[in-house]
Regions:
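NTP-binding/hydrolysis catalytic cores, primarily Walker-type P-loop NTPases
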Residues: 216-254
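Inter-motif core of Ras-like GTPase G domains
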Residues: 110, 124-146
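Beta-strand-loop-alpha "switch" segments that mediate conformational coupling across diverse proteins
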Residues: 195-222, 234
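Walker A/P-loop phosphate-binding motif and the immediately C-terminal alpha-helix
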Residues: 2-39
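Conserved C-terminal guanine-recognition region of P-loop GTPase G domains, centered on the G4
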Residues: 148-163
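Gly/Ala-rich phosphate-binding loop of Rossmann-like dinucleotide-binding domains
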Residues: 27, 131, 159
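G-domain G4 guanine-recognition motif of GTPases
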Residues: 9, 142, 167-182, 204-211
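P-loop/Walker-type NTP enzyme "switch/lid" segment
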Residues: 35-113, 215-220
Length: 254
């Protein structure tokens, strides 16, 4: 079982769309998937999916409910996945002990092939704890310069906590492949120079007006608009994750 954390240094990168889409795509690759919305302050995976029941993450965090009793099933075409979330804002004051309970539950969820954890944006303590304990971290950035700056800060803090978690980098909302690679290389060059680590560029998602259409309709992009460039890119990224090991860490920081 692999725990994949989806992270971003700032809000507005499309992180939750990526998490929801990868859950959908990996389920269609015959993985048994759990999507955990761990954005404790602003949970919205359920909104993206258009579901009214999103599970009982609060019960898992406070220790009153077992994971298997707290998830809900989301049907996704010929496949489906489980969802563990809570209404937005309900878990804004989640503490360290509750996060440890969640981690324990996820790490023992061996009946899944993959657990996708949609982290909160930024670098607060809960976010970094969850990222450091994941098996792999996918860091979502956009062409916005602030996104790059904050993504570098995220990678720096993560690597200071654990050098075994060199993140993948995924560029969202790129105009084309050239811009996607340019944005990724800017972040990778800084990481090589100052963090002595080489994150792996996982790919890019093109700027696509159908993405916002799917979000407004509260329908998953890959079922609502499966032939769009963004959907095709996300399916390709899922295939890479499905058969590709996490990048190897370098030794130390400076």
């Amino acid at each position: 079982m692999t725990i994949t954390a989806i992270a971003s240094g700032k809000g507005g990168t499309g992180k939750t769309l990526v998490a929801v889409s990868l859950a959908h795509a990996l389920a269609h690759l015959d993985e048994r998937v759990l999507l955990c919305d761990a954005d404790f302050g602003l949970a919205n995976a359920g909104v993206h999916l258009g579901v009214s029941q999103c599970g009982d993450l609060k019960g898992v965090l406070d220790g009153t409910k077992a994971l298997k009793d707290a998830v809900v099933r989301v049907e996704s075409g010929r496949a489906g996945f489980d969802l563990l979330a809570a209404p937005s804002g309900v878990l804004a004051t989640t503490g360290e002990a509750a996060v440890e309970r969640l981690l324990t539950a996820l790490q023992h969820a061996g009946h899944y092939d993959r657990v996708i954890v949609d982290l909160g944006a930024g670098v607060d303590a809960n976010v970094m704890t969850l990222a450091a304990r994941a098996d792999e971290v996918l860091l979502v950035v956009t062409p916005d310069p602030a996104s790059l700056t904050d993504a570098y800060a995220f990678a720096k803090i993560l690597l200071r906590r654990t050098t075994s978690r060199v993140p993948y980098v995924l560029v969202n909302m790129a105009m084309n492949a050239t811009e996607g690679r340019r944005i990724a290389e800017a972040l990778l060059a800084s990481a090589r120079a100052f963090l002595r680590a080489t994150p792996e560029f996982l790919g890019f998602i093109p700027l696509d007006p159908r993405v916002s259409d799917a979000v407004r309709r509260q329908r998953p992009l890959l079922t609502q608009f499966p032939q769009t460039p963004a959907a095709t890119a996300l399916e390709g990224i899922a295939r890479k994750l499905h058969g590709q090991p996490a990048p190897v860490a370098a030794a130390g920081l400076r």
